[in-house]
Amino acid sequence: MAVFTVNGKTVTAEKNQKLLRFLRDELRLTSVKDGCSEGACGTCTVLIDGKPTKACVPQTDKLEGKNILTVEGLSDWEKKVYTWAFGEAGAVQCGFCIPGMVISAKALLDTNPDPSREEAAFAIRNNICRCTGYVKIIDAILLAAKCFREGKLPEAPVDWKVGSRVHRVDVEEKVTGTGQYPDDVYLDGMLYGSAVRSQYPRARVLAIHTEEAKALPGVVCVLTAADIPGINKVGHLKKDWDTMIAVGDITHYLGDAICLVAAKTPEALAQAKALVKVDYEELPAVHNPQEAILPDAPLVHREGNLLAHKHIQRGNPAEALAKSKYLITRRFSTPWTEHAFLEPECAVACPDGDGVLVLSTDQGAYDTQHEIMGMLGLPAEQVKVRNCLVGGGFGGKEDVTVQHHAALIAYLTKRPVKVKLTRAESLLIHPKRHPMEMEFSLGCDENGIIQGVAAECIADTGAYASLGGPVLERACTHGAGPYQYEAYEIDGWAYYTNNPPAGAFRGFGVTQTCFCIETLLNEMADKVGISPWEIRYRNAIRPGGVLPNGQIVDGSTGLVETLEAVKPYYDEAVKNGDPVGLACAMKNAGVGVGIPDTGRTRLTVRDGKLHIFAGASCIGQGLGTVLTQTVCGETGIPRENVVYERSNTWIAPDSGTTSGSRQTLFTGEACIRACQDLKKALEEHSLADLEGQEFYGEYLGKTDPLGADVPNPVSHIAYGYATQLCVLDKDTGRIKQMVAAHDVGKAVNPLSVEGQIEGGVVMSMGYALTERYPIDENCRPTVKFGTLGLFRANQIPEIKPIIVEKPGLNVGGGAIGIGEITSIPTAPAIAEAYRRYDGELRTELPLKNTPYAKK
């Protein structure tokens, strides 16, 4: 037992436990987030006697007489200052890390009221952010310091039209910790659920012994596949992922659920899981595509080890390469990568009539609903899904991980339940970025004009399909780069293995093939005798040009403008003798390739305010702010009369997944269309007169399938374009500056666009230099959150985001999403900078022999 002070009140911890658990579970101080429980991420940072401390580390028995402060304990003035500063700086995206950042900022400003930028970065070095790239968080700390020194608070922006730099609609709840993520939900009588996972990557389950676990006091149920009333398989495009492995069936990876346990307390849950005994027949595993392709390879799935094969061809690349003045062929290798979103997967489910209600953190509430409907055998009206706040996704929360398990327990026990992954489980279970082995050949004429490209790509898609097929397709369609030439051919294969699944990850396959084509272009520039900038400028796709996939691009194409935007920085680096690398990229907005892709929005007048409903997840990218600005700009309704509602499946229309950089364009266009009808109604009525009325907008983006025999195939509604460059310190070899110019069509909120650029750049700096997700001979990842190699605030260089607004797109207000493209060209730009630094051509990620390389 220990007695100490929390936020000015004396409290008693009767039993010894981690401070984090005491603050959250007993005091309900949910601003203190559980991001890892390993002392690594900083989301649980509190002040103990004025010192920032991770609450997941100390035990309560060691805190006798201590004074503890959480964000809830800040003064009203401090809360107002930090809310304004983080809003003004654009420092909030998913928000999961923000309360911990605020506490670290307070610790700094209490002792140093006028810190330098370097001091602010150092103060938050133990707080990881995966969204923002830290730049705007540091800006926010300096703004807060200025407010505290001057004792006054500036007004927030009042102009909410499209193009304004506004504070995001969710700033206050994320800064003060009042917004709810699923793990912040506590319900009366709530159970705690978790899965017993496979001990082997590939083994036949012979028997599951649950008797001892069921007999343990506090245990409510132990469920197996036999208890599932509907279908045991889930999966986005291919139903191959087992909800639980049935007796007699074979496991596919170590993350497979064997059974589900639900208990009244977390302690009873842990004890019960340990009492479940499973009999296995261990079987040989498939460790990589090279093994998967062998004629006598074990089958990961009955139908074979090949998930997908993609072949794309335009023109005759073999002939074009044979006639090329210069030809380069190289092999490339890119690794597994972990999303490392700060919020581990969590869902709360409870009975709802004859069905269930699920509070979820995901990238598509309707996708989650459909998976649960199939598993439970229920119609849509009996399965409701509502998004809480989502603590980051980056593609890693497109597949269900805990939602269906929570729904099953709640449905069968008629009790509310929380199912949450530990950080170790999260690292194992959700799909990662595909590792790929690639070979690219590039041919150019004497002027550096691309004549043709031929390529092959082999991807490890892991244990389940997830989105491996579309990822492979996108890697192939975009492997040609954003350049105009006619001869292109690529073959891609994705193979099942018994490794963790691979699926969607920011960049969606393009990150891998971009590394290849851009590295070859940099090498080719030397052969031709021109600069890497010049070879891109000569080949850049321009309005009216034809991409290697056959699509004629429209007037909104802004690649040349991004090249021109970085030219002064490139020339300055060359003049100063600083090693500099350059790379370009393009990325589609929307699903495309002939697949129906629809955005939908419903505007409802309630209590004199306009409520925005869109069934699209806001995972940190700022969709709620985009739609709010759209409504304010299109209708003239004041910001204070507009309410953005979180996604759900019973009022908000299905707007598709938050993926493919699609929501700003597709749901944004749907919102514009709904606003047009509302605006007409407002010509004759006040908003109050329209009480109870609804205004609906829908936009279907029509595209052509790959290989469509039409004169101008439209693979995608729109593309974003980018040029990034990396400048090294010529003495230390460390990155001095990253410059990122991105064509976004129209920046709805430039503040958010800059934040997306900065965050994407830092994420792919890690991809290029430091991040690792090693898997051992047992198909088990051997990392913890703290050893992933994520960049910290005091390690980032100057980042210069440049917004290019090329008009011409006639939907979505001209705006093109940039959630993915911001991290695509970063790695090849960095690789080229190091080639200029030491002459070594690097074709494998993470890059070797740099000051950042793991010793």
What spans do the regions from the language model cover?
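Signature of N-terminal electron-transfer/Fe-S-associated modules in redox systems
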Residues: 1-155, 593
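Short beta-strand elements
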Residues: 46, 173, 179, 346-351, ...
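Glycine-rich loop/linker segments at domain edges
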Residues: 90, 164, 170-176, 305-347, ...
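Flexible, low-hydrophobicity surface segments
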Residues: 145-307, 327, 412
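C-terminal catalytic domains of large/alpha subunits in multi-subunit enzymes
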Residues: 225-226, 377-382, 412-417, 446, ...
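Phosphate/diphosphate-binding loops
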Residues: 257, 263-265, 414-462, 669-688
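Helix-loop-helix junctions that connect adjacent transmembrane helices in secondary transporters/permeases
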Residues: 294-376, 540-609, 689-714, 784-792
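Thiamine diphosphate
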Residues: 393-414, 418-419, 623
